[in-house]
From Swiss-Prot:
InterPro entries: ATPase_proteolipid_c-like_dom (IPR002379), ATPase_proteolipid_csu (IPR000245), ATPase_proteolipid_su_C_euk (IPR011555), F/V-ATP_Csub_sf (IPR035921). The keyword Chloroplast does not apply. GO terms for cellular component: cell periphery; fungal-type vacuole; fungal-type vacuole membrane; Golgi membrane; membrane; proton-transporting V-type ATPase complex; vacuolar proton-transporting V-type ATPase complex; vacuolar proton-transporting V-type ATPase, V0 domain. It is a multi-pass membrane protein. Present with 538 molecules/cell in log phase SD medium. GO terms for biological process: endosomal lumen acidification; Golgi lumen acidification; proton transmembrane transport; vacuolar acidification. It is found in: Vacuole membrane. Proton-conducting pore forming subunit of the V0 complex of vacuolar(H+)-ATPase (V-ATPase), a multisubunit enzyme composed of a peripheral complex (V1) that hydrolyzes ATP and a membrane integral complex (V0) that translocates protons. V-ATPase is responsible for acidifying and maintaining the pH of intracellular compartments. This is V-type proton ATPase subunit c'.
Amino acid sequence: MSTQLASNIYAPLYAPFFGFAGCAAAMVLSCLGAAIGTAKSGIGIAGIGTFKPELIMKSLIPVVMSGILAIYGLVVAVLIAGNLSPTEDYTLFNGFMHLSCGLCVGFACLSSGYAIGMVGDVGVRKYMHQPRLFVGIVLILIFSEVLGLYGMIVALILNTRGSE
């Protein structure tokens, strides 16, 4: 094996695969969570739109909150991609760390999107019958959204460990 292709034990040639997998996991899973939240909430909005069209604008809050989840994944994916380079040694530690960053934010946003979708769908339908539920629904949506934010915070903390 030539000296050019030889790698040290801490930076094997396959290590960047894990970084790319983390980048992909961050985007795919967080966008999947955003899509689930948007679709489930959108079903409820479409359901009330036929009865009370004036409530549609106030009912878009779950859809907007679901879209923010994809931004969390995008931020982490961009940070991971910024650390990937074909010319520098990429350690196995960094590869696993970036994979865990992507999975952390991805699964957190996936679960958050599912929660937002469920609360958004049922909440919008019940809001049509009882407008006083609006504040409670928004609070539950905020607590559902913060699950994805927790995943992003942990991913950012993990990402800073690799660049030390």
